[in-house]
């Protein structure tokens, strides 16, 4: 019953047939007050660095700073970004936009960095495409594929200047280079990376998932640990498992307990607290949430990884009361009986 409910509630989309975690990152950095700057583009697939391009201050052009993997062949990748990942386009857009942000009256201390992150991750029943902008290390805005524009994240608004607004004279190309990938093409691109890397990079490794609790008075921190997994991308959704019980409620939706973060499950930056284990391509992640201790056995983690079917994981050491999962009768019928 519970497993079936999770499958129904999961975001079911077409996904590639194996692990695919693709991230392009563009970072613009002001180095000093003399307007000297740096710009870097990185391409990672399943945590493997494919290319790192850095601005050559003497030539003003991108320069490759690493040796790409021998298996990498960009001619076999659909929708692969041309012109060195559109290096000069994003350099100019991000430079202009950060300059406009720093000129705003509300900007008391000028920002030094701006990053654009584009990509997607396949977590079986959870396919996430993302495109977002961070300024000064904090996420400012996310590209909304439904409305085809940047939108605010939960905790803040964002200045509609430069490349962040549909009024930009370059908006058509922003949509071409960013919008199309976030909205549509990223999973196909990631699938091509997977096909050409097959046999050359490590196979996905299924994590062991365990939920433990750290009790401090009236509150308990639940930790959903993914141990020894590859690639690094994981996500969790927290639910009150009593919502899955067949009882008197008529609400067809199960409410997710949202962690306090501006990132979406599966995005880089989502608070999974992921670290690499030694020199191997193995990772451990420990997303967490704080709940009232009385709820510690009722709140469950649904874990997502490219090797996992979504499953419910409950705390193994919590002291809260056990959840009530049996059928409790039909409130509507009870009320009708009282009226009779």
From Swiss-Prot:
PROSITE patterns: IG_LIKE. Keywords: Immunoglobulin domain. It holds the Pfam family 2L_N_poxvirus. Residues 207-294 form the Ig-like domain. Disulfide bonds: none annotated. This is Putative Ig-like domain-containing protein C1. It comes from Swinepox virus (strain Kasza) (SWPV).
